Amino acid sequence: MRESSQIRETTETKIKLSLQLDDGKNVSVRTGVGFFDHMLTLFARHGRFGLQVEAEGDVFVDAHHTVEDVGIVLGNCLKEALHSKEGINRYGSAYVPMDESLGFVAIDISGRSYIVFQGELTNPKLGDFDTELTEEFFRAVAHAANITLHARILYGSNTHHKIEALFKAFGRALSEAVERNANITGVNSTKGML
């Protein structure tokens, strides 16, 4: 099974995270940031991934360090779980509607970290979650996993719905990208490596 478990401990956070790419039965998320827990759970469920997260952070300051560090550890686990990247689709994309909002995510498991994030988040805070941390999370994942990630909110009026559409689209796009494909021999690249 393609899986990884890692712990990251700094003076600001302690993150324990396990990711299973091929078994989505076990999802348990506790970061101390309720809205973020909800989004990570949606990502795992819609990607059909197993995900267990236990995070302690300096949320008395704000949620920035916790959200960013969870993104870093998730990216590290994704990179480790994929190993050589042989036989996977490599690319994945998904449009996901959430009522009046539409989110889009495209992913390339390229070995090159890059992110494009586009979207207007008009409500600056959802519970204890600063909505600008949405981009910070995706940036942390992309850089740690060495993937190219495009995330875009096409339209919508409800900030919760916009972010939810993105996290669901992220799960679905990543699921497609990491899916094993019997028609692919080696890695899906003319270079012979990713």
Curated annotation (Swiss-Prot):
The protein's annotated pathway: Amino-acid biosynthesis; L-histidine biosynthesis; L-histidine from 5-phospho-alpha-D-ribose 1-diphosphate: step 6/9
Alphabetical keyword list: Amino-acid biosynthesis, Cytoplasm, Histidine biosynthesis, Lyase
Catalytic activity, as annotated: D-erythro-1-(imidazol-4-yl)glycerol 3-phosphate = 3-(imidazol-4-yl)-2-oxopropyl phosphate + H2O
Enzyme Commission number(s) of this protein: 4.2.1.19
Coiled coil (UniProt feature): none
Name of the top EC class for this enzyme: lyase
One GO biological process term: L-histidine biosynthetic process
GO cellular component: cytoplasm
InterPro entries: IGPD_sf, ImidazoleglycerolP_deHydtase, ImidazoleglycerP_deHydtase_CS, Ribosomal_Su5_D2-typ_SF
Gene Ontology molecular function: imidazoleglycerol-phosphate dehydratase activity
One Pfam family from the record: IGPD
Alphabetical list of PROSITE patterns matching this protein: IGP_DEHYDRATASE_1 (PS00954), IGP_DEHYDRATASE_2 (PS00955)
Membrane spanning stretches: none
Subcellular location: Cytoplasm
Protein family (similarity comment): Belongs to the imidazoleglycerol-phosphate dehydratase family.
NCBIfam families reported for this sequence: PRK00951.1-2, PRK00951.2-1, PRK00951.2-4
Name the record gives this protein: Imidazoleglycerol-phosphate dehydratase
UniProt organism field: Bacillus cereus (strain ATCC 10987 / NRS 248)
The gene coding this protein: hisB
